[in-house]
Amino acid sequence: MALKELLGSDAPLEKVCSALLEYESKRKSSENIDSESKKTNLLEDEQDDIEPVWLQLATLKFIGNNRKLIPYKIAIKNPVIPSSSEACLIVKDPQRVYKDLVNEAGLSKVVTRVIGLSKLKAKWNSYEQKRQLRDQFDIFLADDRVIPMLPRILGKTFYQKSKVPVPVKISKGTAEQLKREVVSAYGATYFNSAPCSSFMIKCGHVSNTSTELAENVESILQFVSKHIVPDGAKGIASIHLKTSQSIAIPLWNNPNLKELIASSRKVVTKETASSKRKSDEESLPSQKKQKKVEVAKESKDSKQQNVSDKKQVTVKEVPKKLSVKNAAKTTNRDEDSKGKKAKASPKVSQSSLKANGTTAIKKVKAGKNKVKH
């Protein structure tokens, strides 16, 4: 599929690629004016040759992350991974079997190290050791059967620096399958999915020609519009090309961008309004239930309060009744004591009368005796 069929317009793809490469060549020449620095800094020249070119895309909608730390593999015509780069292969135990397969397939210059899971856990345990392993190799390949276990073992040091291991299928255990998978991995570019509306994919190097870059860009755009961007090519807002040292050169801008943004906002508002209605409708029965529960609670509380009030009344009345009874008892006791005293008083008066009578009789007798004498 041509770029015109994909985007619906004649995008000057090769012109943009050649303009970017020309800009980079001028930048390098301006930075390396001194001839002596060109002779001495050979490493810098090599690094400039492998300066990556990035395809930057902006989308109308957010891209979800459904890959679970597995990168998208995008086949391209011109490899972005240099053939001189070294790879590390992470495999299941025992690792000796896969080392023999690498030698048998003639990949010992490409896959320079094979590591089993048990050795990876034991030897590269600390953060510093994992960082050294990450910086030692250009690309990491991993048996697709161990991919789910690697995030926990390798940690953030790998996944934050875009050194996500590329899955390869080597379950058959043959040299032919291993060679085919490694060649396919080197002939592709990768995209680590994340929730975003703007992202970049490596599409080549400054050492490539403008035609090679244009071919890679077309392959990437076809894959992205089919597998990554929602709504396909219609969901792309803009396309740019850039390097790490250059500005973003526009390749294509959606001519209907304003209308699409306005329509998408309307759709969003409609969706939010419908979701609010649904939430309100769903909340109505819950509100009714809540009201019923509150009414039931209130009736329960009122009943409990009435019961407690009754208990308090009975508790208050019981002492009164008890006090009345006690008062009655005390009054009865007083009356009994008074009756006893009343009964006892006549006895005392009779005895006193007898005593008085005897004394009076004695006095009378004494008076008679005096008269006789």
From Swiss-Prot:
Basic residues composition bias: residue spans: 362-373
Location in or out of the cell: Nucleus, Nucleolus
Keyword Nucleus appears in the UniProt entry: yes
Xref: Pfam families: Ribosomal_L1 (PF00687)
UniProt feature, compositional bias: Basic and acidic residues: 292-320
Gene3D superfamilies: 3.40.50.790
Biased composition (Polar residues): 347-359
UniProt cross-references to InterPro entries, sorted A to Z: eL8/uL1-like (IPR050257), Ribosomal_uL1-like (IPR023674), Ribosomal_uL1/biogenesis (IPR028364), Ribosomal_uL1_3-a/b-sand (IPR016095)
Region feature Disordered, mapped onto this chain: 265-373
GO molecular function: RNA binding
Family listed: Belongs to the universal ribosomal protein uL1 family. Highly divergent.
Self-association state and partner proteins as the record states: Component of the 90S pre-ribosomes.
Job of this protein: Involved in rRNA-processing and ribosome biosynthesis.
Name this polypeptide is given: Putative ribosome biogenesis protein C8F11.04
Organism: Schizosaccharomyces pombe (strain 972 / ATCC 24843)
